[in-house]
Design a protein with these regions (language model features):
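Extended, solvent-exposed, turn-rich assembly/linker loops in the middle of proteins
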Residues: 131-215, 228-246, 250-256
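Gly/Ser/Thr-rich active-site loops/lids in small-molecule metabolic enzymes
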Residues: 216-221
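N-terminal alpha-helical "arm" segments
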Residues: 1-25
Length: 267
């Protein structure tokens, strides 16, 4: 349905001091702190998880060498989505408006809507990361869980007990990340690179990441997280995260990828 003079009645009358409600600042490109962007020219993209080899065993003199098998374990498919929204104006609404050019005004509003949709959908990958169904990865498990199946057994990428952001929980996360293993149970030299938090956690994160001494204690201990450079890229706030208690650590082991298609020539 087109926007008509009925929806813009006040703008047909002289004497308005201002029109407001559309000129707000935006949170720009916060998805880039979570995802690395790659281009795509296909309807979907697939990524295959590979398994290498187990640790080698001792071979007795003259005995045959033991052989091991490498294999594919699972495939993740990423299906592109088309995000669309439009508006239309009646000729009379355009001609009889006494103020700014309304087509330009609402084109800017539409761009803001599209941009915020992009940020919301990107953050929803983390917002839904703990859900047991409907948002599973290629291994059939939620993005963050304690039962990711591998050839060597189940692996976890979450705390044994979920906890709010604190010195204790952040240090335990560093310990857990250092113990990550691959499909065959070989240790991965993974390191936390960036802390991703909702805005409600920014003050806690600032104290934890930048205080020279430990936070909330009278002990004259150094802040080990800071002095050891455990999170070299610091913390970033994502204003589209919906759980005020959640925090996420991006490691250097595997990156999240945001796949983009060329903009349609018809848009």
């Amino acid at each position: 349905m087109a926007i008509s003079r009925q929806q813009l009645a006040k703008e047909l009358e002289p004497g308005l001091n201002a029109l407001f409600g559309l000129e707000y600042k935006n949170y720009e490109n916060q998805h880039a702190e979570i995802f690395d962007t790659e281009n795509s020219d296909r309807a979907f993209e697939e990524e295959v998880m590979l398994s290498g080899f187990d640790k080698a065993g001792v071979k007795s003199e003259g005995a045959a060498v033991a052989y091991d098998n490498a294999q594919e374990t699972f495939t993740a498919r990423y299906q592109h989505e088309t995000i669309a929204l439009a508006f239309s104006l009646t000729e009379e609404a355009i001609e009889d408006n006494l103020y700014d050019k309304i087509s330009t005004r609402y084109t800017k509003a539409l761009a803001r809507s599209m941009a915020q949709t992009k940020q919301t959908k990107a953050a929803n990958v983390l917002n839904n990361a703990f859900k047991a169904s409907g948002y599973n990865g290629g291994d059939g498990e939620s993005l963050i869980g304690n039962a990711h199946p591998t050839i060597a057994g189940n692996l976890s990428n979450r705390p044994a007990t979920l906890a709010d952001l604190s010195e204790t929980s952040l240090e335990q996360a560093m310990i857990d990340i250092a113990s990550f293993k691959d499909e065959r149970g070989l240790k991965i030299a993974a390191k936390a690179m960036k802390l991703i938090i909702p805005s409600a956690n920014q003050f806690v994160a600032e104290r934890l990441m930048k205080s020279a001494n430990r936070v909330g204690t009278a002990d004259n201990d150094i802040n080990a997280l800071r002095s050891m450079g455990m999170v070299p890229q610091g913390y970033v706030v994502n204003n589209f995260l919906t759980d005020d208690d959640a925090f996420f650590l991006k490691t250097d082991a595997v990156s999240y990828t945001h796949l983009t298609l060329p903009t349609s020539q018809y848009v």
